[in-house]
UniProtKB/Swiss-Prot annotation:
Gene3D superfamilies: 3.40.47.10. GO terms for cellular component: cytoplasm. It comes from Staphylococcus haemolyticus (strain JCSC1435). This is Putative acetyl-CoA C-acetyltransferase VraB. InterPro entries: Thiolase, Thiolase-like, Thiolase-like_sf_Thiolase, Thiolase_C, Thiolase_CS, Thiolase_N. The keyword Zinc does not apply. Keywords: Acyltransferase, Transferase. It is an enzyme of class 2 (transferase).
């Protein structure tokens, strides 16, 4: 079996829903990433075997194929778009690594893209031309059967109650996320994973959801979204627009090209959980992954866990017995935002640029009651 390495991973800055990137379709969000990749590795672009992208709320079609053509990649390169809800971007990278392992190709571009601002409205199709009722709009697709398909907020509250996560702890974690992201933007760390955009003549190079001066006191003053709840707009992620991609290739090829460092793909797990507790997906995914690789949680020195809600991150940390110092060391999606399919690629880009680790995991809870997790090992020649 061949070995797969991630040698490059970047993302755009993330825009707020209805914010600075609201006018950009998914293909336009991906364009600067493809351009940066072509400039960095021009010698491999004609050797790409496939482009694998996640996308959840787009307008259909094959975003991967359309975006690679719009970016000027060779028309002989195919594209495939995957949908595993918000885990789609991470799943696309896992898919590409496995394709390299089984010798189905040597070079893949994988990641995800999402424009919540440009997502089309969906309405129920009338069964007859004589129907007189007003159009019924769908806020989102159903993830599970009726009675097992809570809203994201309800699911986050379910997790908070089931795992005894307090409002105070959720707010403290949210403040930590904003504080860490602001710190690592200011010292230049996070800039290494970002390809800036030019929007209406102005440079857009920082996540729009970030609130660098957010304090615990301000978070404590926010009202819960649900009556008697603990989840607020402050201790949850926002809806966002953005993209992220990675370049994955066979290790032997990377060595022959003189590439000096990257991340070696070790293994990945995707599993299901109770849909009413969907945010807890990282717990069984990471547990199964460690068991398969005969590792302990103490062997993992960096974990990037998508921050959809403070409640599910804290529940996952507690259940996995993680040290907080290993988790989201530069902050996470509560501060940077969560553009669904792009988030998994962002976790991988963060791991690639994060220093001082040997084994690292990227993991996500997924709509419909799932979780995925991927294990990388730092690789240097």
């Amino acid at each position: 079996m061949k070995e797969a390495v991630v040698i490059w991973a970047k993302r755009t800055p993330f825009g707020k829903y209805g914010g600075a990137l609201r006018h950009l379709e998914p293909e336009a969000l991906l364009l600067p990433l493809f351009q940066n990749l072509k400039q960095t590795f021009p010698e491999v672009m004609d050797q790409v075997d496939d482009v694998v992208l996640g996308n959840v709320v787009g307008n259909g079609g094959n975003v991967a194929r359309k975006s690679l053509l719009e970016a000027g990649l060779n028309h002989r390169i195919p594209g495939i778009t995957l949908d595993r809800q918000c885990g789609s971007g991470l799943e696309s990278i896992i898919y590409a690594c496995r394709m390299v392992q089984c010798e189905a190709g040597k070079v893949f571009i994988a990641g995800g893209v999402e424009s919540t601002s440009r997502a089309p409205w969906k309405i129920k199709r009338p069964q007859s031309v004589y129907e007189m009722q007003l159009p019924q709009f769908f806020e989102r697709a159903s993830f599970a059967p009726e009675g097992q398909d809570p809203s994201m907020i309800e699911a986050a509250e379910n997790v908070a109650q089931h795992y005894n996560i307090s409002r105070n702890d959720q707010d403290l974690f949210a403040a930590r996320s904003h504080r860490l992201v602001a710190t690592h933007f200011n010292n230049g760390d996070i800039n290494r994973e970002i390809v800036p955009l030019t929007i209406k003549g102005a440079l857009f190079d920082r996540d729009e959801s970030l609130k660098p001066n957010l304090t615990e006191a301000r978070l404590h003053r926010l009202r819960p979204i649900l009556p008697n709840g603990t989840v607020t707009v402050g201790n949850s992620c926002m809806k966002n627009d953005g993209a992220g991609i990675a370049l994955i290739m066979e290790k032997e090829m990377a060595v022959a090209m003189g590439i000096k460092w990257g991340m070696l793909y070790r293994d990945a797990v995707t599993t299901g959980v109770d849909p009413t507790l969907l945010g807890i997906g990282p717990v069984p995914a990471v547990s199964q992954l460690l068991k398969r690789q005969k590792l302990n949680i103490e062997d993992i020195s960096a974990i990037e866990l998508n921050e959809a809600f403070s409640s599910q991150v804290l529940a996952s940390i507690n259940e996995l017995h993680l040290g907080l110092d290993k988790v989201n060391q530069w902050g996470g999606a509560i501060a940077t935002g969560h553009p669904y399919s792009a988030s998994g690629a962002a976790l991988v880009a963060r791991l690639l640029n994060l220093p001082n680790w040997q084994y690292g995991i990227a993991t996500m809870g997924i709509g419909g009651g799932m979780g995925n997790a991927v294990l990388f090992e730092k690789w240097r020649q």
